[in-house]
C-alpha cells in the first residue's frame, strides 16, 4: 500500500483475505451485502466511480461480482496519483471480458494462503524451509518439533483455515476442513465458469489425487481409482 495505488489480495476462500484487509481499511464496500447488492451492481454498470468514494484505503470486497470495478480502480489511481487508495479481495472466478487493463503499475498482487503452523503458534519456527532449500550449510541438528506425529497428522488434516482454529473441539476443527471440500465439490467447481459439474465425480477425483499425494502416478491409475469408487 505504500508503493501502489491499489492492492489485490488473492488466495483460496476462507483463508482470511477480507478479515486481514478490513484491519487495514478505513472504509469498506461489501459487494455481496444482500440489502445493497442489486443497487451496487446497477451503480457499477452505470457509474462505477461512485462506489469508490470513501475513506482510504477503501476495501472493495468480492469485487469480481462487478468486474468493471477493476478498470474504475485503475482510472482513479491514475487520477489521484497517491499510494494506498484501494484494497481488492474476492474470488479468482472473474469475467475477464469486462476488464480492459492489466492494472500493471497501479494494482499490486499479493498471494495469501491459509496459516502455517508458525502462524497458528503450533510450531516453534526454529527450522526455516527457505533456508533448507537455499543454504547448503544450514544446520538443523538438535532442533526438535514439540508436536507429536499424531499432532502433525491432525494439523495436516485440519489445515490452516482461521475458522478451524476458532472451533471448540478437534472434531469440529476437522468438520471445517470437510465442509470446505464439500463446498468446492457442490458449488465452486460449477460457479467458476457457470458450467454444471457432477459433485460426486468431483469428490472422487479429489480422493484419487489425495491418495497419491507425494507419489508419481500415471493418469490411468488415477482414472482406475475414480472409476472403481
What are these regions (language model features)?
Residues 17-18:
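Conserved lysine of the Walker
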Residues 59-60, 85-91, 111, 120:
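Structural recognition of the conserved hydrophobic beta-strand(s) that form the central parallel beta-sheet
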Amino acid at each position: 500500500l505504500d508503493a501502489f495505488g491499489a492492492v489485490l489480495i488473492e488466495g483460496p476462500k476462507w483463508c482470511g483475505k477480507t478479515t486481514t484487509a478490513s484491519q487495514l481499511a478505513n472504509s469498506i464496500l461489501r459487494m455481496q451485502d444482500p440489502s445493497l447488492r442489486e443497487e451496487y451492481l446497477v451503480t457499477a454498470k452505470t457509474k462505477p466511480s461512485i462506489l469508490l468514494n470513501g475513506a482510504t484505503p477503501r476495501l472493495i470486497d468480492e469485487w469480481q461480482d462487478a468486474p468493471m470495478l477493476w478498470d474504475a480502480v485503475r482510472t482513479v489511481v491514475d487520477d489521484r496519483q497517491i499510494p494506498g487508495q484501494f484494497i481488492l479481495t474476492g474470488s479468482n472466478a472473474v469475467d475477464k471480458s469486462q476488464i480492459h487493463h492489466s492494472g500493471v503499475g497501479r494494482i499490486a498482487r499479493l498471494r495469501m494462503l491459509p496459516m502455517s503452523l508458525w502462524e497458528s503458534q503450533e510450531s516453534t519456527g526454529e527450522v526455516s524451509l527457505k533456508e533448507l532449500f537455499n543454504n547448503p550449510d544450514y544446520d538443523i541438528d538438535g532442533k526438535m518439533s514439540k508436536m507429536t506425529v499424531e499432532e502433525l497428522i491432525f494439523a495436516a488434516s485440519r489445515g490452516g483455515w482461521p475458522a478451524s482454529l476458532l472451533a471448540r473441539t478437534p472434531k469440529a476443527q476437522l468438520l471445517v476442513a470437510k465442509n470446505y471440500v464439500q463446498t468446492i465439490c457442490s458449488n465452486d467447481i460449477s460457479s467458476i465458469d457457470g458450467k454444471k459439474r457432477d459433485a460426486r465425480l468431483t469428490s472422487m477425483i479429489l480422493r484419487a489425487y489425495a491418495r497419491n499425494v507425494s507419489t508419481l502416478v500415471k493418469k490411468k491409475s488415477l482414472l482406475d481409482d475414480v472409476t472403481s469408487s
